[in-house]
Amino acid sequence: MALFNSISKIGSINSKSNTLINSTMNGNAFGSNEISVLANTNVNAATNTNLSVAGITLVNAKTNTNALKFKSITKCNSCCNY
């Protein structure tokens, strides 16, 4: 009997990306360009791996070999009368 218990857990992987682009263009006499860029990037990665292995192995081997019984009876009756 072999028993194997395996539990594998992989945690959450969160990726958040926020990008805010504000572009304002004002055309004055001299001309001015205002560009505001706000970029926030949050990457949270958490990986948890739990591996539990419990193995119980029982091997019962029983071998019985009976001796080969061989019985040979040979009778030779030779009677020679001359």
From Swiss-Prot:
Name this polypeptide is given: Putative uncharacterized protein DDB_G0291089
Domain of life: Eukaryota
Species this protein is from: Dictyostelium discoideum (Social amoeba)
